[in-house]
């Protein structure tokens, strides 16, 4: 696997779609408001809206609106839940491919995940950049003629945007976009030049042997301190995590009787670390990005599979506290204890996959669409499968009939 190295958001080496990725442009702000996907991966006529209609009184999440635009409300914290293979990871990877397509203007990777290459594949994404503009980017990839290869001529992109006004909501701003005629460039490369202000951070489950998993961010002033707190919480036998000043890119995880020296992600002897402790390293890197305000869009995918529920809840609480204004977090989990956190109902989205003959379709439903009253119990709704997102366990019990 090629490893990415980043300096101020510029990719120096590697491909775009490894399991962790950071694009950092410190002066930018990026918030996703709506996404529609058709004929990519298992997403067919898929839509997820990330605005919410009215202010929540005494919300545990502060400032879920654009600074200076109190009517422009967006879902700052997005907890994605659902059974296995329901699209939680795929959704993040699809977003990352869309972001890279808009940023790098190369279509190869996004074209590689078209589900049916004989049909049109489309996506439409609405997002805010620089706290000033709402963009709508609509992309249609048409199938090539029989015997021909896909080229840039098969790709049609429309970029429209308007400046956000003082009293605008997302809905009023979008209406103005749809009513405003804007000139369209002759090819998708020129059209995408209109898009500015992209920045993001993604983290996915990685193989424990992956070098990038253990690499210390060279430009981080807080990573080692954060890692020290997290690893000592995960493993009481760890007494400290220290940066080795005499060796660039190296740090030591120490117990009273032994140490693990990690240099540039190389891990010669960490077999004694638990899976959960190893996961803590990647989590520390994302929290460092939040604390140092390196990105404003974060996608944290199942980084807590080996970590105790109470630790996961505590770290998620810290992430939410660190988000600050004009930021956005996506967090995928199977841990139903997360439902007990006092978050707005609109923070929870449930994913499910339906199979129709030979085809499958990923769908999502936001808790606030079903639970309208403040007294409605989210935990009870999930336990009673009100969102139709519970895993199918029948086949598991059928094993007993063998």
State the predicted function of each range:
Residues 8, 19-96:
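Pre-Walker A-like glycine/lysine-rich segment at the N-terminus of P-loop NTPase domains
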Residues 308-309:
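Conserved D-loop-proximal element of ABC-family nucleotide-binding domains
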């Amino acid at each position: 696997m090629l490893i990415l190295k980043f300096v101020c958001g510029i990719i120096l080496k590697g491909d775009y779609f490894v399991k962790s990725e950071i694009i950092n442009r410190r002066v930018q702000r990026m918030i996703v408001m709506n996404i529609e996907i058709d004929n990519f991966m298992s997403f067919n006529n898929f839509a997820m809206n990330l605005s919410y209609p009215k202010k929540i009184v005494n919300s545990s999440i502060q400032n879920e609106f654009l600074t200076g635009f109190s009517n422009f409300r967006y879902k700052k914290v997005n907890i994605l839940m659902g059974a296995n293979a329901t699209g939680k990871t795929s959704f993040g990877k699809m977003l990352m491919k869309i972001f890279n397509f808009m940023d790098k203007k190369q279509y190869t990777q996004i074209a590689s995940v078209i589900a049916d290459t004989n049909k049109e594949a489309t996506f439409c994404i609405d997002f805010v950049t620089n706290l000033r503009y709402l963009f709508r980017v609509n992309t249609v990839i048409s199938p090539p003629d029989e015997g021909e290869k896909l080229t840039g001529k098969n790709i049609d992109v429309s970029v429209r945007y308007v400046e956000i006004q003082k009293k605008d909501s997302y809905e009023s701003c979008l209406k103005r976009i749809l009513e405003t005629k804007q000139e369209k460039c002759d090819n998708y490369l020129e059209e995408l030049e209109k898009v500015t202000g992209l920045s993001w951070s993604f983290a996915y489950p990685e193989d424990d042997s992956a070098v990038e998993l253990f690499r210390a961010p060279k430009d981080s002033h807080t990573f080692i301190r954060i890692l020290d707190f997290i690893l000592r919480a995960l493993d009481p036998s760890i007494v400290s995590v220290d940066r080795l000043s005499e060796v660039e890119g190296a740090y030591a995880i120490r117990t009273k009787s032994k140490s693990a020296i990690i240099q540039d992600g190389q891990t010669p002897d960490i077999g004694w670390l638990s899976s959960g402790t190893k996961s803590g390293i990647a989590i520390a890197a994302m929290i460092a990005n939040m604390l140092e305000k390196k990105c404003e869009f974060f996608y944290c995918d199942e980084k807590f599979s080996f970590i105790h529920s109470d630790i996961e809840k505590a770290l998620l609480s810290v992430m939410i506290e660190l988000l600050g204004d004009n930021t956005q977090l996506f967090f995928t989990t199977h841990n139903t204890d997360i439902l007990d956190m006092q978050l707005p109902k609109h923070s929870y989205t449930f994913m499910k996959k339906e199979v129709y003959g030979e085809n499958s379709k990923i769908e999502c439903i936001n808790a606030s669409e079903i639970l309208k009253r403040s007294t409605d119990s989210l935990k009870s709704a999930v336990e009673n499968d009100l969102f139709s997102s519970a895993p199918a366990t029948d086949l598991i019990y059928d094993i007993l009939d063998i």
